[in-house]
């Protein structure tokens, strides 16, 4: 917007009016283009106010914005919200007469002008300092009056000017600027969520697969009680959230058999996503898992282990779901009177009825809200939403807003493998996190482009980097050997503050149902899959310890707990990728170097952008590998060799940056001006 002074391209700003995203304790960088006519100096102030229970609720704080050294028109600042809720910020531009005067008189003195020629300049400066002294404390007022007196004294011009240029006076004026032609910007919103919306590690497991085997070696159906026992291992690996696929009754009509066959055996358990039977629907638990009370006991055990339970919200129904019997209007009824089942040609899902949200929207909205609120009231605060991009956007916007009115702590993860317009559209209307195409990004070029993009979109979307899912076993894992599992885990755990693992990954499960498919052989979606995690660990056939170490490193390094700041460094081998993250609040800096080749040792010369690390040109510094504990002396140019059978990655922790070198690292890196 342009008033007396120009204020353009304020960021973060979501163009359709939705709030930007942030979490408690996160740096929120704010930038703006401020400009004016002529040569007079211009400055900007960031005004921030928070919700009622924040530290800045009663009176907004004002933060002086600083220009980017190589782009004087861009002003920068940041704030750190301390409570969840809706925060408001505004950028004001103002003419800075003091800076204009300082620049002018300094230039004239350097040009050799004397006392007589500078009479008006000194008098103007004295008057500015007298104006600036108004409303200050007695001590500060006296300091500025002394400067004015010095400017009016005769004698050497440099000596007269010197008191006006001291660090203490400069700092005092920065805290209490003399502002003219103040132009107020637009109030913009930031939706601040609890920290788990950004910093989180997820582990997915099927509760029904936690029952082990009977004496004959036959899998036993798990319960909420056996799941509670399984949580101890999950917590030991350092995960924050354990996610369960649907725990509801499973339809018996058109039930799928093993490996998605249409001819199930009597003992086949079906797909958990075919929700609903005579035993209940979305507000019931599968009878073989246990009762609602048993589920509450599981929640209590999870809390004891500092784990959060995420439930699957899949808005679809099996043919024998109560909705299909009592609310046929929720679905699409065909000409022959049957209800349409789900299709994604040529695939057919005869065991699932998709909901038609245009048939009876008010009742559907009311029923889904009732179901979600039922689980929230039991203590569930996170939902992984199945295929939200196949449901209307306005429904999700309404539902998330309605739940947040009473329970703002609830997190919604969008399982939306879809086009950017849909993925980012869902994020803008309220989803806290989103699945991504990380699984399919395998080359150095693809990974660099992907990580740069997710950092750039941090105001809108928070990516959850799952290394695998029950639906996705990427070819790189099928054929890359054990080293590839470690490589992908290291990348996911360090590229985003949110990452996830589906059970079995730590056992290097890699067999596909057929060549060219990404479906697991003997998929857990259709059968019980108990696993001998303890035996695998004893045999050395497990990635558990490595995953636990990654989560430990993430917790210990704030740089890995933020999304916005990632910088790639040059490595002269297309199989070696190097990138860094810096936390501007603590000065914590982490440099990650990964060998993308799971079969061969790779060497590279890594050339660091020292400025991106907050370091001076020519700096030498010690780095500590958080994986091995080894220490090295590094500089701008460094040799790296990584062997898959030993170490697939370095995660180097650099010396803590001093406060004086941190601030600029929090600023937005804007390469193009957005009009």
From Swiss-Prot:
In chain numbering, the residues marked as site (Transition state stabilizer) are 471
Which reactions appear under catalytic activity for this entry? alpha-maltose 1-phosphate + [(1->4)-alpha-D-glucosyl](n) = [(1->4)-alpha-D-glucosyl](n+2) + phosphate
Q: Identify the catalytic residues.
A: 386 (nucleophile), 415 (proton donor)
Which molecular function terms from Gene Ontology are attached?
Answer: hexosyltransferase activity; hydrolase activity, hydrolyzing O-glycosyl compounds
The protein's matches in SMART domains, at most eight in alphabetical order, are given as: Aamy (SM00642)
EC class (word): transferase
Give the Enzyme Commission number.
Answer: 2.4.99.16
List the InterPro entries. Answer: GlgE, GLGE_C, GlgE_dom_N/S, Glyco_hydro_13_cat_dom, Glyco_hydro_b, Glycoside_hydrolase_SF, Ig-like_fold
Give the GO terms filed under biological process for this record: alpha-glucan biosynthetic process
- Keyword Repeat set for record: no
Keywords, sorted A to Z: Carbohydrate metabolism, Glycosyltransferase, Transferase
Q: Where does alpha-maltose 1-phosphate bind?
A: 256, 316, 351, 387, 525-526
Q: Which PANTHER family match?
A: ALPHA-1,4-GLUCAN:MALTOSE-1-PHOSPHATE MALTOSYLTRANSFERASE, GLYCOSYL HYDROLASE FAMILY 13 CATALYTIC DOMAIN-CONTAINING PROTEIN
Quaternary structure per UniProt? Homodimer.
Function field: Maltosyltransferase that uses maltose 1-phosphate (M1P) as the sugar donor to elongate linear or branched alpha-(1->4)-glucans. Is involved in a branched alpha-glucan biosynthetic pathway from trehalose, together with TreS, Mak and GlgB.
Spell out the family assignment given in the record's similarity comment: Belongs to the glycosyl hydrolase 13 family. GlgE subfamily.
Q: What name has this protein been given in UniProt?
A: Alpha-1,4-glucan:maltose-1-phosphate maltosyltransferase
Native source organism of the sequence: Corynebacterium glutamicum (strain ATCC 13032 / DSM 20300 / JCM 1318 / BCRC 11384 / CCUG 27702 / LMG 3730 / NBRC 12168 / NCIMB 10025 / NRRL B-2784 / 534)
From the broadest rank down, the organism's phylogenetic lineage runs: Bacteria, Bacillati, Actinomycetota, Actinomycetes, Mycobacteriales
Encoding gene, per UniProt annotation: glgE
């Amino acid at each position: 917007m342009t008033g007396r002074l120009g204020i353009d391209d304020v960021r973060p700003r979501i163009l359709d009016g939705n709030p930007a995203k942030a979490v408690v304790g996160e740096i929120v960088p704010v930038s703006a283009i401020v400009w004016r006519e002529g040569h007079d100096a211009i400055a900007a102030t960031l005004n921030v106010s928070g919700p009622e229970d924040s530290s800045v609720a009663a009176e907004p704080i004002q933060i002086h914005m600083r220009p980017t050294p190589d782009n004087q028109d861009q002003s920068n600042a940041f704030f750190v919200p301390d409570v969840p809720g809706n925060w408001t910020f505004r950028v004001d531009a103002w003419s800075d007469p003091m800076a204009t005067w300082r620049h002018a008189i300094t230039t004239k003195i350097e040009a050799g002008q004397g006392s007589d020629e500078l009479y008006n300049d000194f008098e103007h400066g004295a008057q500015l300092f007298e104006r600036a002294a108004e409303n200050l404390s007695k001590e500060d007022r006296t300091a500025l009056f002394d400067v004015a007196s010095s400017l009016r004294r005769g004698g050497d011009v440099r000596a007269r000017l010197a008191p006006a240029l001291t660090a203490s006076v400069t700092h005092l004026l920065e805290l209490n600027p003399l502002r003219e032609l103040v132009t107020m910007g637009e109030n913009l919103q930031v939706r601040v969520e609890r920290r788990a919306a950004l910093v989180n590690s997820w582990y997915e497991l099927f509760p029904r697969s936690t029952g082990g085997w009977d004496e004959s070696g036959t899998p036993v159906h798990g319960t909420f009680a056996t799941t509670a026992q399984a949580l101890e291992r999950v917590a030991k690996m350092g995960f924050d959230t354990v996610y369960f696929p649907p725990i509801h009754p499973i339809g018996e009509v058109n039930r799928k058999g093993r490996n998605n066959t249409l001819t199930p055996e009597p003992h086949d358990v079906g797909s958990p996503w075919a929700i609903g039977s005579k035993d209940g629907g979305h507000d019931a638990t599968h009878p073989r898992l246990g009762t609602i009370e048993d589920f509450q006991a599981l929640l209590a055990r999870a809390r004891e282990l500092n784990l959060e339970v995420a439930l699957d919200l899949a808005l679809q129904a099996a043919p024998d779901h109560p909705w299909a019997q009592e609310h046929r209007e929720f679905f699409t009824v065909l000409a022959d009177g049957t209800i349409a089942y789900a299709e994604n040609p040529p695939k057919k899902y005869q065991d699932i009825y998709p909901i038609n949200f245009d048939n009876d929207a008010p009742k559907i909205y009311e029923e889904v809200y009732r179901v979600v609120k039922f689980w929230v009231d039991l203590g569930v605060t996170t939902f992984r939403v199945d295929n939200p991009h196949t449901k209307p956007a306005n429904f999700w916007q309404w539902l998330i807003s309605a739940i947040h009115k009473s329970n703002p702590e609830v997190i919604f993860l969008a399982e939306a493998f879809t086009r950017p317009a849909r993925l980012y559209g869902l994020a803008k209307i309220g989803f806290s996190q989103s699945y991504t195409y990380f699984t399919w990004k395998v080359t150095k070029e693809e990974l660099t482009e992907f990580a740069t993009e997710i950092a750039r979109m941090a105001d809108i979307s928070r990516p959850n980097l799952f290394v695998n899912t029950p639906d996705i076993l990427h070819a790189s894992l099928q054929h890359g050997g054990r080293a590839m599992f470690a490589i992908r885990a290291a990348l996911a755990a360090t590229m985003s503050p949110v990452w996830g693992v589906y059970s079995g990954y730590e056992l290097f499960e890699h067999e596909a149902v057929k060549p060219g498919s990404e479906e697991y052989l003997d998929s857990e979606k259709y059968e019980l899959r108990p696993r001998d995690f303890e035996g695998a660990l004893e045999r050395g056939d497990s990635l558990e310890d490595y995953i636990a170490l990654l989560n430990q490193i993430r917790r210990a390094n704030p740089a890995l707990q933020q999304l916005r700041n990632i910088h790639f460094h040059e490595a002269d081998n297309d199989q070696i990728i190097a990138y860094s993250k810096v936390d501007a609040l603590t000065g914590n800096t982490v440099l990650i170097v990964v060998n993308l080749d799971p079969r061969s040792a790779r060497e590279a010369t890594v050339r660091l952008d020292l400025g991106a690390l907050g370091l001076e040109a020519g700096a030498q510094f010690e780095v500590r590998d958080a994986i091995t504990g080894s220490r090295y002396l590094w500089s701008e140019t460094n040799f790296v060799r990584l062997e898959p059978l030993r170490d697939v990655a370095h995660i180097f922790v650099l010396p803590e940056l001093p406060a004086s070198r941190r601030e600029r690292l929090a600023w937005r890196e804007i390469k193009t001006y957005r009009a």
